[in-house]
């Protein structure tokens, strides 16, 4: 029975009535029960949509997020089996988000209006409201507004709105029919987080989107019903657009860690996509990446990202001169902010992975980026003051003149909006480059003099303490080697790195032994500590001696190099590090080769061991198989004896069963003929002769009864038929006369109508002939032209068809030849196979004939032995009879009757008969 029809207007009217009497919760519950009921499973989308819309309106008003979630999933469960249902699911999700956003906008507007009114009241009485209690309350409220809001009602609605967005995203996720709706809800959720500054919610949103993408990838490999196909370009483009938007919002909210993770997601999707992203989208990607690298302090990749961005921005037809000036100046400053080239390091450089985000094959160098910043397409659009600053620090850097030039230029640069963020790295560059130049020109300098040389107006001002910090940092980075004497406030520079490193090594003084003798009378704890210090000093001395020895060897090799002798301290350190890295790589290579040799020998040894184990296992298996074969042979021998005994018993039972089965079959055939019916239970007591006799008797009886009945029926039928004909003859004559009259009347009527119709038709045709006779000549001309045209066309078609016919004949001839060849090959193959089969059959027949002849020979021998045995027994009986005194002669033992031979038949034996014959022969043996 079909479920009752669902009427949405009744449910909505019932909900409105409950709301009107102040029971909105009951109205919501009634709609939820209707959505969860069994009737809703069979309803279509058009019927349920008004109900779910009303349900969502009430749920949003009452802030019942959990019930809304359950209702949405119930609706999706009912509708997800058809394309129309999925379209309705998307419409319901969009309606839900519209309701949420509208409600949130209204709440925010009411709150803003209330705050404005409170602000006006506070301005009227500025002092009256300031009390200790109010101050404490305000402080407490500020502590509670970490999320950005101090209104409980607004916060509750914000939480509800966020939960609604999250529910909707989970409701729409990973369904190919809902991709567009899902993408729209994702963008609206990001706008919500940005509008209300919800940083924590945005982090959760980003993590949720990653989980959805992972789940889509997992489901794509296992399921196939409406799953998201990431190989589809449109789908992948939508996911890429979501991640680009995610990066933009992350940067706007200054969530740099989340922005970097989003950048990695974008880069991964761009690699999967076969479509190249739009230049505007790619430019936005590089701009955000530059901001992220700047915040992380990676000025090298920051400048590389600006270079990528600027190269794309040059192709923008809508860009203005002011935009070019801003971005070119930004690129020049980012290139200047890069730290001086790093020294070579051993091991993996973590920045290589970051370079992959910029589609760079290798780590960029400062020199290349400075060259790119000095190209004509950048210089001609950059700010003039920025170019002057660039020339001072890069092109024509001079410590003595740089101070005066920068002092005059810095006030103009401070006014630039893009200069403020690069103050710290640019000041660091200027100070470090100045320190390096001073270290090249002088071996020592007074700290005050150096401070005066590097002091610049704001924002490049520098204190003595900061100067010492910069000196130490430069020394730690191996740009210079310094020693500061605070008594004289002098800074000394070392020119050779080996001298500085050897001086820094710890040396154990020779007086350590004498100190131990002087302190021999100290306490036990003091002596133990001294002994431990001596051991530690001895280890340090040994290690330092080894390091000093290696450095000495390395210095001898490098000092023979002319470039090393003429280079600066920084260049010498670079050469030393390159040489050390080269040597370390050689050592690692040798160790790797040795490890490979050891691994190879271990593998060979393991292989030999496995082969020996295989040989032993094979021998054990052969021995076990031999024992099992012996045991099996013994068991088979006993089983054969038991089988022979059982076979003899079974043979007798089978003889009886075969006889009974044959009789039942014969009885069934006899009963099927319908002549006589015999009970199958009597099969044991009947023979074929008895059954045939019963059938013959029954057939004779039936034939006799039939003859008697036929004779009686023929006599009865003859008299009855004669009486019928005598009675119907006058009636037939009367009917014939009446029929003749009716036929004559019908003929006259038909003839009259035919004459009238023919006259009318003749008149119409005569009028038509006279009308057409006027155009007969024109018709003949048109007919002749059409015939000529069709004749020409017919000739062309005939020629074309003849050509096609000839071509078809050739193809058919070739096909017939090929088919005959294949048939001949198949015939020869079949003949070969038939000959082989015939030979095999002849061989089998010869084998059977040999076995049959051998069996007959054995049977003849046995019969001969039995005959001789009977003769011997008869002779013995005769002897015994003649020697007895009793008048009654003894009856001789009758000879066993010969076995009844079956009638010879040309019909081949069945499988059961062959098995029976085999068992009988075995029993005789």
Swiss-Prot record:
The species this protein was found in: Kluyveromyces lactis (strain ATCC 8585 / CBS 2359 / DSM 70799 / NBRC 1267 / NRRL Y-1140 / WM37) (Yeast)
Tell me which Pfam families the record gives.
Answer: eIF3a_PCI_TPR-like (PF22591), PCI (PF01399)
Q: Does the keyword Phosphoprotein apply?
A: no
Q: Which residues form the PCI domain?
A: 324-498
**Which intervals of the chain form a coiled coil?**
534-666, 785-885
Q: Which HAMAP family match?
A: eIF3a
Q: Which UniProt keywords apply?
A: Coiled coil, Cytoplasm, Initiation factor, Protein biosynthesis, RNA-binding
Q: List all Basic and acidic residues biased stretches.
A: 112-121, 839-880
Oligomeric state and partners?
A: Component of the eukaryotic translation initiation factor 3 (eIF-3) complex.
Task: Name it.
Answer: Eukaryotic translation initiation factor 3 subunit A
Q: Name one GO cellular component term.
A: eukaryotic 48S preinitiation complex
Q: Which gene encodes it?
A: TIF32
Q: Which Gene3D superfamilies match?
A: 1.25.40.860, UVR domain
Family to which this protein belongs: Belongs to the eIF-3 subunit A family.
One record GO biological process: translation reinitiation
